[in-house]
Structure formats: C-alpha cells, structure tokens
C-alpha cells in the first residue's frame, strides 16, 4: 500500500490533457464509491460529485468555466457540488451513536444544536 507521504509527493497538477485518453463511466463510479468513505465535517457528506464526460456537456461547462481549454481536452470534468442543507441530517446521522451508547443524550443534543447553529 502506498504511504500518504508517497501519495502527496507524487501528486501533480495537470493543465494539459491528451484528448485521446478516455475514462469509462465504470472507472468513475469505482472512484466515487471510494470517495464516500472519506471523512467530512460532522460526517454530513456535504460534497456531491457529478462527472461530465459527454463532449456537448463539457462544452457547456467550458463556457461556464471561463473557457478554460483544459475542460475540453480532459477525459472528464468533475463538478463538485456542496449541499447547503446537509446540516439538517445531523440528528439522524448521530442517532446511531446515541442508540449504541457512544454518546449520551446531552452530547447528542449539544452536537445537533452546535452544528445547526454553525450552519444557520
């Protein structure tokens, strides 16, 4: 398994892509199924990812993205959307911890209250 340090050192930003390289919908699905395991603030899973591989749709994204040329040559464009209402799920998300006794009623109520206050 690759270490975190190796991953960070190997990562590069790309601005030029080979338009002949494609990525399949299955490969994208596999990647995004793994992303679901990544932690998020308060476990709310705010981010939603929408892959765009259709050339016509990529042209629309190209226009919306200030005509960045890399949008047209990339295998896929990933639109990252944030759920501004995700905090409404803090109660149901934490009910499992409450029912298992990981947190008590006071901690549950404080968590729901503080997360809600932070977002409203």
Stretches with model-predicted labels:
Residues 1-120:
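Acidic, surface-exposed loops and disordered segments
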């Amino acid at each position: 398994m690759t270490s975190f340090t190796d991953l960070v050192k190997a990562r590069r930003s790309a601005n030029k892509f080979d338009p002949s390289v494609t990525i399949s919908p299955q490969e994208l699905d596999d990647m995004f199924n793994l992303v679901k395991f990544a932690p998020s603030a308060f476990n709310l899973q705010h981010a939603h990812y929408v892959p765009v591989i259709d050339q016509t749709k990529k042209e629309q994204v190209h226009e919306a993205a200030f005509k960045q040329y890399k949008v047209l040559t990339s295998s896929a464009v990933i639109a990252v959307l944030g759920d501004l209402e995700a905090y409404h799920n803090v109660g149901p998300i934490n009910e499992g911890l409450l029912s298992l006794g990981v947190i008590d009623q006071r901690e549950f109520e404080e968590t729901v209250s503080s997360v809600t206050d932070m977002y409203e």
